[in-house]
UniProtKB/Swiss-Prot annotation:
Taxonomic placement: Bacteria, Bacillati, Cyanobacteriota, Cyanophyceae, Gloeobacterales
Gene3D superfamilies attached to this UniProt entry: 1.10.8.60, ClpX chaperone, C4-type zinc finger domain, P-loop containing nucleotide triphosphate hydrolases
Alphabetical list of InterPro entries matching this protein: AAA+_ATPase, ATP-dep_Clp_protease_ClpX, ATPase_AAA_core, Clp_ATPase_C, Clp_protease_ATP-bd_su_ClpX, ClpX_bact, P-loop_NTPase, Znf_CppX_C4
Keywords: ATP-binding, Chaperone, Metal-binding, Nucleotide-binding, Zinc
Disordered as annotated region, ranges: 50-74
Binding site for Zn(2+): C10, C13, C32, C35
Name of the protein in its database record: ATP-dependent Clp protease ATP-binding subunit ClpX
One family name in Pfam for this protein: ClpB_D2-small
GO CC annotations, alphabetized: HslUV protease complex
Length: 437
């Protein structure tokens, strides 16, 4: 009879050595033959289930681009029609509008031609667009308005949040995920959309010469964007975030996606002036801000690809955004027009809101001019207008809906200067006061 030690027990089932056929010892633990058999059964069951279930596969996109037919491609607006639509929503920037109108028309005409090409015809390459201009001059609005006109998905990405693969931050493929979400998950629609990448100047490398250290949010991002801008089939994780080997991917072909990149490119004018031999901007006399802005625009109109290389963009990246449009800084007259002229002008929005309460809203010309002057001093373009007007109109929007005696409000220059509407000019109006619910 074999000798058993009654103190030795299986660490899993608790049976003693004499109750089992074999007890295997480890460093401080024991396992019996019965528990080993049970573990083997569990493993065999999982292996069997894994073999019978289909493995996760990427969502395939048909390779034949000729099948990507969209009825909207048959009705591409002409460049003059595109510019006319832009004029209704964006003030100024006439040259930039022309460049955008032609580029967008050619891009979607290129997509339309792919539906009918036989294979031996001239292939039209994609022309992405670079918008250069100060903050608040209308770069994002131009791209958004184009997408609205063409009825295509539109997504905005911030280049400053992007890093190359393997580092903390967003992968460039997450840009495509945003576009896919806007397209309600329809891959075919997303593949004809427009992506606006803002702050593209912030991913410029620090010097013209390649760095020996890794620039994961500058040159590294430019390298990561190259294939996407040119046209590739990208694997996009459906839930966003970082990729891992065992997740499913959605495949998106970027060959027909129009990329519009925008940035302020502060200091680029000095690079241009050094090349053409002009004296650096230096100091300008007080009271001449508009003259300085005009000199800045004139310098940027002489922009060449080499200037962008010296600024910090790599040549391969510049080659994939051949269309460059320089937007002008907004002067006081342009800011006044932005307040009053566009279809969705800010003052028109407030007038409509108060009209719903049966109140007529009037902004005196001097008040509008004062708002524009203050916005121009802030140097943030059209963005400053909303901040000033919302601060001014806060008390009006709070007080007027509850006042049955107010039928007409007049905003004067003094109210704008004091940032106070406590002394509203109240006049009789022909608008009926709506009954409260």
């Amino acid at each position: 009879m074999p000798k058993y030690d009654s103190h030795l027990k299986c660490s899993f089932c608790g049976k003693s050595q004499e109750q089992v056929r074999k007890l295997i010892a480890g460093p401080g633990v024991y396992i019996c033959d019965e528990c080993v058999e049970l573990c083997n059964e569990i493993l065999d069951e999982e292996l069997f289930e894994g073999a019978t279930q289909p493995q996760p596969q990427p969502t395939k996109v048909k390779a034949s681009r000729s099948s990507r037919r969209d009825t909207s491609l048959k009705k591409i607006p002409k460049p003059q029609e595109i510019k006319s639509y832009l004029d209704q929503h964006v003030i100024g920037q006439q040259e930039a509008k022309k460049i955008l109108s032609v580029a967008v028309y050619n891009h979607y005409k290129r997509l339309s031609s792919k539906l009918e090409e036989s294979g031996d015809e001239v292939e039209i390459q994609k022309s992405n667009i670079l918008l250069i201009g100060p903050t608040g001059c209308g770069k994002t609005l131009l791209a958004q308005t184009l997408a609205d006109l063409l009825d295509v998905p539109f997504a905005i990405a911030d280049a400053t949040t992007l890093t190359e693969a393997g580092y903390v931050g967003e992968d460039v493929e997450n840009i495509l995920l945003r576009l896919l979400q806007v397209a309600d998950g329809e891959v075919e629609r997303a593949q004809r959309g427009i992506i606006y990448i803002d702050e593209i100047d912030k991913i410029a490398r620090k010097s013209e010469n390649p760095s020996i250290t890794r620039d994961v949010s500058g040159e590294g991002v430019q390298q990561a964007l190259l294939k996407m801008l040119e046209g590739t089939v990208a694997n996009v994780p459906p839930q966003g975030g970082r990729k891992h080997p065992y997740q499913e991917y959605i495949q998106i072909d970027t060959a027909n996606i129009l990329f519009v990149c925008g940035g302020a490119f502060v200091g680029l004018e000095r690079v241009v002036e050094q090349r053409i031999g002009k004296r650096a901007m230096g100091f300008v006399q007080a009271g001449e801000p508009q003259k300085r802005e005009q000199r800045l625009v004139e310098s940027l109109k002489a922009l060449e690809p080499d200037d962008l290389v010296k600024f910090g963009l790599i040549p391969e990246f510049i080659g994939r955004i051949p269309m460059v449009a320089v937007l002008e800084p907004l002067d006081e007259e342009a800011l006044i027009e932005i307040l009053t002229e566009p279809k969705n002008a800010l003052l028109k929005q407030y007038q409509r809101l108060l009209r719903m309460d049966g109140v007529e809203m009037v902004f005196e010309p001097d008040a509008i001019k004062t708002i524009a002057q203050e916005a121009f001093r802030r140097k943030t373009g059209a963005r400053a207008l909303r901040g000033i007007v919302e601060e001014l109109m806060l008390e009006v929007m709070y007080e007027v809906p509850s006042r049955a005696d107010i039928r007409k409000c007049v905003i004067t220059r003094e109210m704008v200067e004091k940032r106070s509407t406590s002394e509203l000019l109240i006049l009789p109006s022909s608008l009926p006061k709506p009954e409260s619910a």
